[in-house]
């Protein structure tokens, strides 16, 4: 049976009520998110490499971002310690602002019946308005739909490039969770929870994306992070100019794997 984890701050009762009002959520195990907002920076520096974060991302980390990373890592620890989860099996991790597509469970079941060939499967994305938003294809293209693998009502494939997709909902293999835990047993974490490019390049943890999405952030909720990350929106013309090259990269990446 698929293990499902919901990351939620203890104070966010209404968020959990909204999440659990959705169908197929009764089997989620709630993990109390690590609240870093009241900790001082010296305390945080003891458990998170603030200086390495700044060197890597060229900016200061926020307390909320540290809490987010530590919370996801703590869930990975639980996955690793769970003897009921096989090394090559997936667990589902969601945040409490997750809004599921009406056919979420049907498509999730279909996905899990496939040989997905990636350690992380991004079922959703943050800061997106719709499950099949136009920006998904323009900014984060995959290969041509007829070359994608299809199951249920969704396609899955490698994106043209791993990117910051948020952590609203994803599948992760136990073997990948173990790799994260091995990393932090040697050095303090310094990364953002959704730096999938770093995970691919440094930890050899690959990810695939699902199109259309089956999870998005609930639009009635506002993120707990101190600041919303993400690049400034480019105008449509600039996006369209970059699109053909991104599409070529996506096609090559999927043909090579």
Swiss-Prot record:
Transferase as a keyword? yes
Which EC class is the enzyme in?
Answer: transferase
Q: Which InterPro entries match?
A: Glyco_trans_25
Q: Name one GO molecular function term.
A: glycosyltransferase activity
UniProt record, GO biological process: lipopolysaccharide biosynthetic process
Give its E.C. classification number.
Answer: 2.-.-.-
* Alphabetic keyword roster: Glycosyltransferase, Lipopolysaccharide biosynthesis, Transferase
Q: Coiled-coil regions in this chain? A: none
One short Pfam name that applies is Glyco_transf_25
User: Which family is annotated?
Assistant: Belongs to the glycosyltransferase 25 family.
Q: What is this protein called?
A: Lsg locus putative protein 4
């Amino acid at each position: 049976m698929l293990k499902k984890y919901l990351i939620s701050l203890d104070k966010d009762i209404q968020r959990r009520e909204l999440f659990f009002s959705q169908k197929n959520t009764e089997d989620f195990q709630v993990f109390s998110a690590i609240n870093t907002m009241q900790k001082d920076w010296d305390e945080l520096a003891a458990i998170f490499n603030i200086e390495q974060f700044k060197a890597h991302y060229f900016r200061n980390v926020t307390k909320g971002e540290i809490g987010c990373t530590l919370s996801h890592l703590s869930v990975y620890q639980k996955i690793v310690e769970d003897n009921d989860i096989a090394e090559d099996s997936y667990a589902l991790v969601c945040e409490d602002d997750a809004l599921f597509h009406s056919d979420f469970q049907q498509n999730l079941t279909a996905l899990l019946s496939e040989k997905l060939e990636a350690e992380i499967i991004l079922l959703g994305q943050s800061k997106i308005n719709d499950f099949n938003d136009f920006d998904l294809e323009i900014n984060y293209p995959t290969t041509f739909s007829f070359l994608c693998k299809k199951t249920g009502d969704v396609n899955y494939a490698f994106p043209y490039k791993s990117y910051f997709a948020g952590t609203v909902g994803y599948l992760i293999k136990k073997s990948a969770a173990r790799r994260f835990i091995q990393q932090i047993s040697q050095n303090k974490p310094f990364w953002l929870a959704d730096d999938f490019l770093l995970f691919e390049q440094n930890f050899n943890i690959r990810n695939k994306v699902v199109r259309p999405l089956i999870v998005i952030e609930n639009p009635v909720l506002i993120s707990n992070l101190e600041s919303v990350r993400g690049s400034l929106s480019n105008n449509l013309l600039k996006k369209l100019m970059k699109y053909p090259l991104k599409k070529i990269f996506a096609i090559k990446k999927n043909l090579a794997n």
